[in-house]
Curated annotation (Swiss-Prot):
Signal sequence bounds: none
Biological classification of the source: Bacteria, Pseudomonadati, Pseudomonadota, Gammaproteobacteria, Vibrionales
One annotated GO molecular function: formate C-acetyltransferase activity
Modification Glycine radical, positions: 100
Key words of the record: Organic radical
Protein name: Autonomous glycyl radical cofactor
Pfam families listed in its UniProt record: Gly_radical
PROSITE patterns given in the database record: GLY_RADICAL_1 (PS00850), GLY_RADICAL_2 (PS51149)
Domain Glycine radical: 5-125
Function as written in the Swiss-Prot or TrEMBL entry: Acts as a radical domain for damaged PFL and possibly other radical proteins.
Length: 125
């Protein structure tokens, strides 16, 4: 478990008011901020802090990224894409976003075009 602390009293004056992240599982302390004597991100053994008093500092953990979501935004009507499938000559410049890159709709295979239409226009999220 990781705990954030600010040292309020210590035998070592360089620790006074410094902020640390303590990892009890690894028995490590990571310096977040200190006036002198310690660098930001410096890692030491918790025992190297010596005797001290502290107050807890709330920390926010970054969200875990597990898989994730992807969003392509195309501002157009379903009818426009369906008409582009039926009459590609009318839409030579129709460009859409697919997986983060721009592509001309007419350069896609018919299967890819149907997939884009199905993914772009849904009834619910």
């Amino acid at each position: 478990m990781i705990q954030g602390i600010q040292i309020t009293k210590a035998a070592n004056d360089e620790l006074l008011n410094s902020i640390w992240l303590l990892d009890s599982e690894k028995n490590e302390a990571r310096c977040v901020a200190a006036a002198t004597g310690y660098e930001a991100d410096q890692v030491i053994a918790i025992s190297d802090l010596g005797e001290y008093e502290s107050r807890e500092v709330a920390i926010e953990t970054a969200p875990r990224i597990e898989g994730g979501q992807h969003l392509n935004v195309n501002v157009l009507k379903r009818e426009t894409l369906e008409d582009a499938v039926a009459h590609p000559e009318k839409y030579p410049q129709l460009t859409i976003r697919v997986s983060g890159y721009a592509v001309r709709f007419n350069s896609l295979t018919p299967e890819q075009q149907r997939d884009v239409i199905a993914r772009t226009f849904t009834e619910t999220l």
